[in-house]
Structures are given as structure tokens and as C-alpha cells.
């Protein structure tokens, strides 16, 4: 009865977190006395990173829809793939407490996810006023962190690795 094929590709950007991460952030408060006069204090909360850019995503989707027997049976199936790069992440580095502020985020991570969506429908008219319908769906998706900051402590310990599928961790061979 019906056959429809779909194909899409797109690229998008996302600036995760604050819109002003390229600028330093300052705080005010904690008055101190100088010569008996209370003075307001100011400090740097976070050092800006002027080199950050948008996180980038490339997305691909292929789908098919079809129905037979006047729409009694129909199927919809989709395969999707997404690759994210330049993900904003906090560096995995230790800085001395004397530094006083955390390190700003940098574009360092990448991940991809892929999967399928399936939907099967059954519709049957019984007489003039009755209809039976049933629908089943199935989805499978896999997310894998391809690149993040990895230290020797996490890289050499399979239970603490930061790369690999999100549900469990392993190191991917490239």
C-alpha cells in the first residue's frame, strides 16, 4: 500500500554550560577592615578560556515506512548515528589549592551514539463501529565515549576508565 524512504543529515553546534565561559567570572563580598573601614572584597571564581568553541554534532538518520493490506500492518524503522566532537569538559588535572580556582573547561571530548528504532502496528476494523489496534516498539542505542581526559590512574584500571560505552567501560581499539 505505502512505501516511504527517509534520509537526513545535519550538523549543529551547542555551547554547553555558561554562555560566557570565554570570560573570567568574579565574585564580590566578604568585607574586610582596612583602618577601621569595611571594604568589599573581590575574587576570581573561574578563569575564562578564550579558546573554547562550540561543541559540534554531525547527525545521520535513515528510515523506512511501509504498510500492506490497506494499512492493516505497518512498519516504521530508523537507523541513527551521531558523532559529537569538541565536547566541553573539565581538564583531568590536579592544581594546588593555592591556585584558588578550578580550571576552566576545554574542548576535549568526543563521543558517538548509534541505534535503531522499530515500530510495528496492526489495525483491523471489525464491523462498522469497532476496531482492534496493537502497536509494538523496540529501541536499541549505544553511546561510546571516544575521547576524554584520561590519566594513568584511570587508563590502567579497567574499572575506572572513562572511555568506552556509557553503560560499562572498556577501551576502544582504534
Describe the residue ranges of each PLM region.
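Conserved small/polar residues in nucleotide/adenosyl-binding loops
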Residues: 169-174
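Extracellular/periplasmic, surface-exposed regions of secreted and cell-surface proteins
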Residues: 1-164
Amino acid at each position: 500500500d505505502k512505501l516511504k524512504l527517509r534520509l537526513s543529515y545535519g550538523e549543529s553546534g551547542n555551547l554547553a554550560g555558561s554562555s560566557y565561559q570565554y570570560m573570567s567570572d568574579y565574585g564580590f563580598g566578604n568585607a574586610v577592615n582596612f583602618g577601621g573601614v569595611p571594604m568589599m572584597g573581590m575574587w576570581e571564581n573561574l578563569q575564562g578560556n578564550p579558546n573554547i568553541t562550540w561543541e559540534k554534532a554531525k547527525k545521520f538518520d535513515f528510515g523506512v515506512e511501509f504498510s500492506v493490506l490497506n494499512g492493516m500492518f505497518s512498519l516504521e524503522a530508523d537507523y541513527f548515528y551521531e558523532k559529537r566532537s569538541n565536547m566541553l569538559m573539565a581538564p583531568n588535572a590536579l592544581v594546588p589549592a593555592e591556585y584558588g580556582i578550578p580550571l576552566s573547561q576545554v574542548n576535549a571530548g568526543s563521543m558517538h551514539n548509534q541505534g535503531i528504532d522499530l515500530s510495528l502496528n496492526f489495525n483491523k476494523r471489525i464491523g462498522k463501529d469497532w476496531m482492534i489496534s496493537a502497536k509494538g516498539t523496540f529501541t536499541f542505542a549505544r553511546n561510546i565515549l571516544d575521547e576524554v581526559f584520561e590519566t594513568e590512574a584511570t587508563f590502567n584500571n579497567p574499572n575506572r576508565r572513562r572511555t568506552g560505552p556509557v553503560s560499562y567501560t572498556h577501551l576502544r581499539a582504534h
